Design a protein with these regions (language model features):
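Conserved active-site-proximal phosphate/metal-binding subdomains
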Residues: 147-166, 172-307, 311
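Active-site entrance/lid segments in N-terminal catalytic domains of soluble metabolic enzymes
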Residues: 1-164
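Tryptophan-centered motif/residue detector
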Residues: 7-8, 41, 267, 271, ...
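Conserved protein kinase catalytic core
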Residues: 73, 197, 318
Length: 319
């Protein structure tokens, strides 16, 4: 499992808890403001994880990742990447433009680059730049999301891409994680489920809204950032807008500058959310959630093996 980078919400506390629990934790570089805070966060994460590993030598501590937004309005991009190179961040997650220069920078110290895409055309462009993995953001993902079914996108990409496949979209429990792996993904990418955790830097009302809502409370719109994404309907209503009559926006409204997009309240007041929300009923500590995910994953695996009347490690025949 990879914990997706969550704008505003992902900070050192959440990332450290995820990695200690064996989940790859991540955060957007732009969450660390001003720019020099990014180095402080990276040093803190590396230090605390190293200390935890030393104190718990048998623990499976996962690496962490930093998300870079590759857009012309992000005036911090190269400075942020220089900081990541300096401290040899294990994984760089890139969004929007295929990042040739970032791939080269990460590979200079042995780092990996995973790029998020919503269709095959974008996936091929990213693969041409030498990324190590593709994050397939399918229908139902929280925040910026695509519209393709994972059954279509995962299987088509695997026909030609030999790198790491990460699946995103409506993955809210261990059963969904197991389904992702069965489909051919190497990792499941969970964002919304980690918003509703003790360590997440989210408004308590946001967490409560996640616990109280379901899939039919999700609205897909481009209004708030210029790119289509999934958002919580009640948060749109609370902001004084009609979720059933939202105008469309275009990509020219996107702004990832160091000062932020002062005109848009996306992420702060308009809350992103995936369609897997129906399984969220509480906001536990990350460690407890990951333990639950593991139990559900194993339950799903056992149910499948029982269904086809075999026991591990025999491989089933579908003929």
């Amino acid at each position: 499992v990879i914990g997706a980078p969550l704008f505003i919400i992902s900070g050192p506390e959440l990332v450290i808890a995820q990695c200690k629990a064996g989940v790859i934790g991540s955060f957007p570089a732009l969450n660390a403001r001003p720019q020099h805070v990014l180095e402080e966060w990276i040093v803190r994460i590396k230090t605390e994880l190293a200390e935890y590993q030393e104190q718990n030598p048998d623990a499976k501590v996962a690496p962490f990742a930093v998300n870079q937004i590759c857009h012309g309005s992000n005036d911090r991009l190269m400075d942020d990447m220089a900081t990541c190179v300096k401290h040899e961040v294990p994984i760089i997650i890139t969004s929007l433009r295929p990042p040739a220069e970032l791939v080269e920078a990460a590979h200079s110290y042995g780092g990996l680059v995973f790029h998020d895409v919503i269709n095959v055309r974008h996936a091929k462009k990213a693969a041409e730049q030498g990324v190590d993995g593709l994050i397939l953001v399918c229908a139902g993902a929280g925040g910026h999301a695509g519209v393709l079914s994972p059954f279509a996108l995962v299987r088509e990409v695997k026909e030609w891409f030999d790198g790491t496949i990460i699946l995103s979209g409506s993955i809210g429990d261990g059963y969904s994680v197991a389904s992702s792996i069965a489909l051919g993904a190497d990792f499941a990418y969970l964002g919304t489920r980690f918003i509703a955790t003790k360590e997440a830097n989210a408004d308590p009302e946001y967490k409560k809204m996640l616990e109280d809502s379901a899939a039919n409370d999700i609205v897909y719109s481009s209004l708030f950032t210029g790119v289509h994404g999934n958002y919580l309907k009640p948060s749109i209503v609370n902001a004084g807008m009609d979720p059933e009559n939202l105008p469309e926006a275009d990509k020219s409204t996107m702004n990832f500058g160091s000062g932020g997009n002062t005109k848009s309240k996306a992420w702060k007041d308009i809350w992103g959310c995936g369609q897997g929300i129906g399984r969220i009923e509480d906001s536990p500590p990350v460690a407890d959630l990951v333990s639950r995910l593991s139990e559900e994953f194993n339950d799903a695996k056992d149910a499948f093996l029982s269904l086809i009347h075999i026991s591990e490690p025999t491989r089933p025949s579908l003929i």
